[in-house]
Amino acid sequence: MHELYLWPFQDAVHAGVGSVMCSYNRINGTYGCENSKAMNGLLKGELNFQGFVVSDWVAQHSGLASADAGLDMAMPDSRYWGDDRLANAVDKGFNRTRLEDMAVRSIATWYQFGQDEDDFPELGVGMPADITLPHEYVDAKDPAARPNLLQQAVEGHVLVKNIRNALPLRAPKSLSIFGYDATSAWAANPAEEGNVAGAPDFWTQSWQGVNLTDEQAHQVGSNAPVVDPPGTYHGVLLVGGGSGSNVPAYISTPYDAISQRAYEDGTEIWSDFASHSPSVVASSDACLVFINAFSTEIFDRPGLTDDASDELVNSVASKCNNTIAIVHNVGVRLVDAFADNENVTAIIFAHLPGQDAGRAVARILYGDVSPSGRLPYTIAKESSDYGNLLGPCQAGKGRSPQCDFTEGVNIDYRHFLARDITPRYEFGFGLTYSSFEYSTLQVDINATANDGEPIGGAPVYTNGTTQNTENDSVIVGGLASLFESVGTVTATIANTGSVTAAEVAQLYLLIPDENVTASNSSIVNTRALRGFQKIELAPGDSRQVTFGLRRKDVSRWDTVKQAWVIPSGAFEVFVGKSVLDTPLQSTFTL
């Protein structure tokens, strides 16, 4: 719990986050929004969170029990707290101090973020009082944000394969563009309820996802209807789905942006967005294939691949020896079906770039900027490499499935390290159009950082109402000592290539674990990410990067002492380009 799941929440609370949402699922048999251990014990207790806890939509399952457990606000409404129920509960003995605490936490957050100030942006009204009514249209555009939005879109692209100098493109004479992801969706109209009448669903869960009554496009020269592959989105995938999604003010599609470049360069553009096995113009200097992988609320992808999209890439590659695959994806998407195809010369994970999808990918493809994204997850060679991660709840299906999390801290790259599984593309991996050299690793550690004593115990939280302040070392985020510096790790990075590019230096630590012994081989200790920095360097330039280490970064949670402890022994340091490419290594002892 502490070393993995609570870890990012602790940093978020320490940074001043105002609200935390409790989940739908149960934790050890108790709903998240009435789980006192999670909300009172961990969040408001150990982390000293001063903001409010809000339920996910309709995730409240009780009245006084959820209030006592730490829930401060129920959304979108509450049949348990509505009308005079809470007031009546106080009259019957419910803790009035807790009720006031719920209100204070919500109002204090309002002031924390300056929402009472005159210069605070006017809030749009998106949700009516009657939640069954359509939401009002909210114009959330900010012209000042446009450059930042484009920059984020560009930096979200991860180049994982680039052979035979396929990229960047250099004023090609002829380009062919394929794939259902290269153009706009059939409709983007917030005035319509759900999907536009007569058009197929935007996402397709199976080959049967298009109804016979839907309007259908047809393959060129064929009566066969166009049906998107399973787990995909019809049109360029811009954003995730669900209640947090939006309709962009405009859409720059890959086809539009590349067509503009073609106009400037005098390039011929050929395209086929419908056929699953398209013909290819022989004169094509390069063939771009755009596919995607989509999921949203209440809809999980059937798997981490889809055969139809893979077949499309391989079909084009069988006719074009310079095929470039671009995947707009919501998360892990396996590509082993075509990754080793020698005619697939480049692969880009474009993720969710938003309204500037086309402009962003064009800047990458044409070398206006070197790609600088890195994988925030591991791409396996096959689905089974992830173990039971893809289906941990097979036992006890139904309304109350039981999911036992037995993997400890070894998820994603730590799972692959622990089981010595070679991935297709490792965590932190990503190519650029340049090359970088790492040198001069220096580790400076405070030798007195480890005094052999636990770093405090779990702070006490009483009655779900107020923080025990007897221990003045407790700050927002938890024990103050956890955020104290214990040292630094520095390294020098040089751009040894011919173009300006950004490198993402990454620091990993292997913390000693006394539970790992020759007689207990079931526990495998693995390195963990402890920092990363992105720096842009011109050709020939070099720069030093420095990673700070906190007590938290070199500690383990002792389940017996119920406290953070800095273990004694040798700590291994790894600095490099990814979790598996760490040319600089060292050790220090505490």
Which residues are covered by each model-predicted region?
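Short, flexible segments with low predicted structural confidence
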Residues: A15, Y24, L71, P128, ...
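C-terminal non-catalytic regions of proteins with extracellular/luminal or membrane-system context
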Residues: L6-W7, G29-E34, W57-Q60, L86-V90, ...
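Conserved, charged catalytic cores of large soluble enzymes
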Residues: H14, E100, V104, A108-E136
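Short, functional N-terminal and low-complexity linear motifs
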Residues: Y5-D11, Q50-V54, A69-A74, A108, ...
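Short acidic (Asp/Glu) and glycine-rich catalytic loops that position anionic groups and cofactors
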Residues: V17-C22, A65-A67, R79-N88, A129-P134, ...
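Second-shell residues forming the walls of enzyme active-site clefts
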Residues: M1-R98, R105, R424, I475, ...
